[in-house]
Design a protein with these regions (language model features):
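Loop-to-transmembrane alpha-helix initiation sites
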Residues: 152, 197-209
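Juxtamembrane cytosolic amphipathic helices that cap and anchor the N-termini
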Residues: 104-109
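A helix-boundary/kink motif common to multi-pass secondary transporters
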Residues: 6-7, 63-67, 140, 197-201
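Short, aromatic-rich membrane-interface segments at the entry and exit
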Residues: 37-40, 68, 129, 199-204
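Small-residue-rich hydrophobic segments that form or flank transmembrane alpha-helices
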Residues: 1-56, 110-113, 117-190, 194, ...
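Short glycine/proline-centered loop/turn elements that form peptide/ligand docking sites
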Residues: 101-102, 128
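Transmembrane helix exit motif
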Residues: 53-65, 73-96, 211-227
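Membrane-interface helix termini and inter-helical loops of multi-pass transporters
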Residues: 30-38, 86-101, 190-200
Length: 227
């Protein structure tokens, strides 16, 4: 809007500038649930990184408009199921308190995060879908934070960021502004989230998922096939 950064440099500037705040929030939230199962956390992070590299070529050929409509429907349903869990309505059970996954649930988490990592290459964010995935698989809501933030941090630090820097497709001044301002914001957000009760945290996740679902719908209608 302010034209402070050349349009061509915006994607690289966003990726490079946000890498520092995202990495900081990942390490802060790694200790958010101290007893979170390392196998679950590492498996999901590795799956997202692998998806970014291996599935990117596949998902880049997907019809973006159809993907956005599908994600709108999926996220809306997931958010509704989570809301029912919070309110104790229907046959969906209660919000889980597990700190790790095993067996079929772990496989589902790995496969889902693999494709979420791939979808990052066409501009589909990983945060909200990963949050919903963790909650629906029965993990403690707090476990969603290290899982989703760790996945994005490693994707940006070892994936897109270095590529944009190598090609010089970023604005250094804007990146430093993002890095410093974002880092301060992350610290403030961490302490706010840390003070929330499980119920409040879960309701916040539900709200984020509903908002994200309608953003997918908006992008499907307005952007169509555009990135």
């Amino acid at each position: 809007m302010t034209k402070s950064v050349d349009d061509v440099l915006i994607p690289g500037t966003l990726n490079v500038g946000d890498t520092v705040p995202v990495c900081i929030e990942a390490f802060l939230f790694f200790d958010f649930v101290p007893d979170m199962d390392l196998l679950t956390l590492i498996s999901m992070i590795v799956a997202s990184i692998a998806g970014a590299y291996l599935a990117a070529g596949i998902v880049s050929r997907f019809n973006r408009k159809k993907v956005r409509y599908a994600l709108f429907v999926g996220m809306f349903i997931l958010a509704t199921v989570m809301l029912c869990k919070v309110l104790g309505v229907g046959p969906f059970g209660e919000i889980g308190t597990a700190t790790g996954l095993r067996g079929v649930k772990l496989i589902i988490a790995i496969v889902a995060n693999f494709f979420l990592g791939g979808l990052m290459s066409i501009g589909v964010g990983l945060y909200a879908p990963c949050m919903a995935l963790c909650v629906l698989l029965g993990l403690d809501t707090g476990c969603a934070f290290p899982a989703m933030m760790g996945s994005c941090a490693y994707l940006m630090a070892f994936g897109n960021g270095p590529k944009f820097i190598q090609e010089g497709r970023y604005d250094p001044v804007a990146c430093w502004t993002q890095a410093i301002g974002g880092a301060v914001g992350v610290f403030l957000a961490f302490f706010i989230v840390k003070s929330m009760s499980l119920r409040t945290l879960t309701i916040m996740v539900v709200c984020v998922c509903y908002l994200t679902s309608f953003l997918f719908l908006h992008d499907a209608i307005k952007k169509g096939e555009a990135a």
